[in-house]
Amino acid sequence: MTLELYQHSLTLNTGEQTTLEQYKGKVLLIVNTASKCGFTPQYEGLEALYKKYHDKGFEILGFPCDQFGHQEPGSDEDIAQFCTLNFGVSFPLFKKTNVNGPDANPLFEALKNEAPGLLGSKRIKWNFTKFLVNAEGKVLKRYAPTIKPSSIDSDIAELLE
């Protein structure tokens, strides 16, 4: 997939249009998020990883999603405010998006194809599914929502060496 990954058009939660091209050459952790989920405290761990590795070429891209139990009901502005006030999130958040089904964000379709889940399933099962992408744009690994950000630290460190 590599180069194609960078062609995806995206909308930041501010409404600004962008592509993944601006993240070319960086290690990425792409996550579908939610504000009212049992895994929401993972924002704290994600922010810790971001602060630890951002200056070394690491980015976290957060994509709020309301497809799982309607646990992300707010507007993009509400979501950004919640994340900043409660968890100090400073990594980029994008417009609320779908990750499964006919209206799924094409980026997530590509991620799921490159890194299927358990038993080859491509569907994202819940909030805080994480995809690790190397600096060349290759999707290396998919992490289940139950995997805490701190458990991914060594994988990120290895890619940044």
Residue ranges and their predicted role:
Residues 1-161:
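Chalcogenol-based redox active-site neighborhoods
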